[in-house]
Structures are given as C-alpha cells and as structure tokens.
C-alpha cells in the first residue's frame, strides 16, 4: 500500500516544526512518511526522492526548510506532485529568510507557501488533506469533523483561568 503524503525537511532540527504536520495528518488518518532530505547536504538524496516520489505513490509533498530554504523549490522543480512549503523559524531572521526563499519561486515552478513555523506545518497538512479529500469521501468527512471540532473548541467568552 502506498503512502499518501511525504513530509521532507532539511535537517533533524526542522522536525520540531514539521512534527506538527505529522500530528495533524495522523489525527485525520492520512498516511505519511517523514524523511530528512537536505537540498545542500544531501543533494543526491533530494534528486532521487523528488524524481521518484510519484512512482513511490506519494500524492502530496510537504517540505519544511529554514535559512536558505531551497528544499521546497528544488523538490517542486523535479516532481509533478503538489509541494507545500513550510518556512522553519530560524535564529537569525525568525524565519523571514525562509519564508522569502520559499515564496519567491519563478513562474512555472509553484510551491504553495504557508506561514512560518507550527501554524504553517499544521496548515500544510490541512491543505494536503483537502487535496486528497477531493477524491476520498471518507477523508472529506473526517476533515469536516476536524474543522467542526476546532470550531466547537473556541470559547464564546474569555476565561480568567490560566
């Protein structure tokens, strides 16, 4: 059986952010495989992964990277699959460098770019779920339930509790 979503990241330290995508996919019952694929330190691994991702059965790629953040764009350049880029917060510029690197792709090589950090990772997983749900009614129902539960979890009034 193939795995629907690939979560790739440039280094182990990126997992602190990208695990939020994994947890969201798990909550929705979506299969995924998380891998470290550095555009700079393991370029051959990146090429092999990106060129083979569709044949491996992946349907969507979520790519997280910090700093120069070339991973999402380079993956998108080598695969026909949709790639969602998650800028990982960096120490030097708080992830703004990552965001600009991922979002400024040339015409013809799209990367769906999300917010910096945890919110971006969660939203990348939700976008992947929405794409997959176009062809999976059971997943569409789970995604609807997830959104309903999120809505119901928001209090109507502020609380004095910490």
UniProtKB/Swiss-Prot annotation:
One of its GO terms (biological process) is 'de novo' IMP biosynthetic process. GO terms for molecular function: 5-(carboxyamino)imidazole ribonucleotide mutase activity. This is N5-carboxyaminoimidazole ribonucleotide mutase. Belongs to the AIR carboxylase family. Class I subfamily. Substrate binds at residues 11, 14, 41. Disulfide bonds: none annotated. InterPro entries: PurE_ClassI (IPR033747), PurE_dom (IPR000031), PurE_prokaryotes (IPR024694). Catalyzes the conversion of N5-carboxyaminoimidazole ribonucleotide (N5-CAIR) to 4-carboxy-5-aminoimidazole ribonucleotide (CAIR). The keyword Ion transport does not apply. Keywords: Isomerase, Purine biosynthesis. NCBIfam families: purE. Its EC number is 5.4.99.18. The gene is purE. Gene3D superfamilies: 3.40.50.1970. Pathway: Purine metabolism; IMP biosynthesis via de novo pathway; 5-amino-1-(5-phospho-D-ribosyl)imidazole-4-carboxylate from 5-amino-1-(5-phospho-D-ribosyl)imidazole (N5-CAIR route): step 2/2. It catalyses: 5-carboxyamino-1-(5-phospho-D-ribosyl)imidazole + H(+) = 5-amino-1-(5-phospho-D-ribosyl)imidazole-4-carboxylate.
